[in-house]
């Protein structure tokens, strides 16, 4: 989930004090670590004028590699997370959130702009 979306949702609640409660905030879409890694790598590639690559291509290129799952985490790790936005939507917040690729792209561009000064 993009920080932009979190801020947008919080500002919406400030504008609507009649809404109260505890709400899940997220995109409502489950994303894999592969998708997150590919989004980051492809955003950096795009900034350098290179075309996006699939996860499979990124693995072949060595941009994504895997390590064995730590035995200490077996049975203790939540490998699937997807925010249930039903209460948030029922409270009146209906704006869409950025896609994973768009949110990561904006963040990478922001970070690179800061590096350039």
Task: Give a label for each model feature.
Residues 1-117:
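C-terminal substrate-binding subdomain of Rossmann-fold SDR/epimerase-dehydratase oxidoreductases
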